Amino acid sequence: MLLHIIARGKIARSPEEELVTRYEKRLTWPVKLTELPETGGRIPDPQTPFKTVLLDERGKDLSSHRLARQLERWRDDGMRETRFVLGAADGHAQEERAEADLLLAFGSATWPHLLARAMLMEQLYRATSILAGHPYHRAG
């Protein structure tokens, strides 16, 4: 299953970009990064069937294990792509939230956009490592 991160704005050269690249290289699942302008821009057509996850401060705060199990269910149900969409500074429109399969939050705090992107990539690596039985995640 393709893990497709769709984000507004360019990450450019930054410490966050280094983290994103580090975890992208470690991932064994296929991953694609799409950067869109802050406004406008067209989200590419998905591989179908697919699921959409919006990163949103009103979303569910899933543990790494719960995220792993959700990805596993979608993969086993035949999803070809899961899209993780990070909105612009003002977040997502109500229509986008209503159409999403999952709203995901990294706790109740608000995170800088670039840091949220790096955190997402790390969590995807962690979740896929859990599913593979890799010792990266140390539950305690």
UniProtKB/Swiss-Prot annotation:
Subunit record text: Homodimer.
A Pfam family hit: SPOUT_MTase
Function: Specifically methylates the pseudouridine at position 1915 (m3Psi1915) in 23S rRNA.
Cellular component, GO annotation: cytoplasm
InterPro entries documented for this protein: Alpha/beta_knot_MTases, RlmH-like, tRNA_m1G_MTases_N
Higher taxonomy: Bacteria, Pseudomonadati, Pseudomonadota, Alphaproteobacteria, Sphingomonadales
Record's protein name: Ribosomal RNA large subunit methyltransferase H
Predominant localisation class: cytoplasm
Keyword Heme applies: no
Keyword terms: Cytoplasm, Methyltransferase, rRNA processing, S-adenosyl-L-methionine, Transferase
Keyword hit for rRNA processing: yes
Subcellular location per the Swiss-Prot or TrEMBL entry: Cytoplasm
Cysteines paired by S-S bonds: none
